[in-house]
Amino acid sequence: MAKEISSELLNTILTRVGGPGNIASCGNCMTRLRLGVHDSSLVDPNIKTLEGVKGVILTSDQVQVVFGPGKAHRATKAMSELLGEAPVQDAAEIAAQNKRQLKAKQTSGVQQFLAKFATIFTPLIPGFIAAGLLLGIATLIATVMHVPADAQGTLPDALNFMKVFSKGLFTFLVILVGYNAAQAFGGTGVNGAIIAALFLLGYNPAATTGYYAGFHDFFGLPIDPRGNIIGVLIAAWACARIEGMVRRFMPDDLDMLLTSLITLLITATLAYLIIMPLGGWLFEGMSWLFMHLNSNPLGCAVLAGLFLIAVVFGVHQGFIPVYLALMDSQGFNSLFPILSMAGAGQVGAALALYWRAQPHSGLRSQVRGAIIPGLLGVGEPLIYGVTLPRMKPFITACLGGAAGGLFIGLIAWWGLPMGLNSAFGPSGLVALPLMTSAQGILPAMAIYAGGILVAWVCGFIFTTLFGCRNVNLD
């Protein structure tokens, strides 16, 4: 195991969050170890000073420790092993902690809600990235080498093979989301997956594609399986709640036989009658809102300028349902490259700080260690190690990101919208081959590269002019 996530470090973190008895849950996203806590008053905020920890975000019931990509997963696995060896609490202590946890939840409802999205979508992100990269590379090769869509031979076969993963992922994505969502909301994953599959089935007997459900109406009422991800999330939440209510009254001997059966019947009825139409309306409204924001240069600037703040508070995972809605409505994720400009603005700010710092200062060492991950789309080392502790550079980094978002918004406003070819992917320079547009991959790559360049330059200029005054540059 790497030094940064040694057992000594994890034991220290465990002690500083109040010990094993204060841990309610242990999980991770791409870059953070997420520890749910019963009592936040027991948490020592100086965890962020530990060597190997790149930052800490504290909420009323969760501690997010920033390690970085890959390391967060290893840290979570090791921490889970440590927690598994922890002594069992007595009933009185558990009751007292549950009371404190309930009180904390009353003041953090929004963060609790958004944290669910991390639980649902974080396990899917590596697949999004892999499938998106393969699709982007295949599309780039086909464009550069002028390979027709109906071409035959080894190269076309290889390109089709690279593209098939993206098709498979997005064809059956709702089933994966339904499974994870049902679990996140406290239900059984397979029940959520089965309910999600109802949104995939076809209800038109004359259709020549898809999977026919076997009926075209629900007891005489029309079926309109719209809403996709939004509807599936609502249905999975309802499924978990209904399962909990059914299990509360179900005798233990009949639980395995009847609980899921009754849950599926009730949830499917609600899905056909209420959730599918409701999800469709919400889906259309959300798509309309963000499509209009994406085509509005000022809206793009605001979104890009505020995204770093969302990352700091750990609520950026809340955008993932929007990404999926845009994929369904546009065929690409036009919001993601706009938000990616936030990280590019931070790179420009960090370079300005490096330029203004003394040759052998600690700040220069910090920037050198964090700039490469920043260029590749991993922004936490720059946020928590360089810009946020000095505040002014963090603000100018946000302004640099806003300038990049404004650039992409202007290009879209002039008639060339572009976006990511996947619901989620890497940002920074790594995302270049994942860009796509109605005019092809090369114009999309050029626009994205232009936005990054604008954000770099503006972040550098804003920080040089306004972000270094009365700021510690040592």
From Swiss-Prot:
Q: Which GO terms describe its cellular component?
A: plasma membrane
Domain PTS EIIB type-1, by residue range, is: 1-89
Which enzyme type, at the first EC level? Answer: transferase
| PROSITE patterns in the cross-refs | PTS_EIIB_TYPE_1, PTS_EIIB_TYPE_1_CYS, PTS_EIIC_TYPE_1
Catalytic activity line of the entry:
N-acetyl-beta-D-muramate(out) + N(pros)-phospho-L-histidyl-[protein] = N-acetyl-beta-D-muramate 6-phosphate(in) + L-histidyl-[protein]
The record places the following residue ranges in the Periplasmic compartment, namely 145-157, 202-217, 282-301, 356-368, 415-440
Query: NCBIfam families, alphabetically?
Result: PRK09586.1
The UniProt comment on domains reads: The EIIB domain is phosphorylated by phospho-EIIA on a cysteinyl or histidyl residue, depending on the transported sugar. Then, it transfers the phosphoryl group to the sugar substrate concomitantly with the sugar uptake processed by the EIIC domain.
Q: Which protein, by its recorded name, is this?
A: PTS system N-acetylmuramic acid-specific EIIBC component
**From what organism does this protein derive?**
Shigella dysenteriae serotype 1 (strain Sd197)
Whichever gene encodes this chain, its name is murP
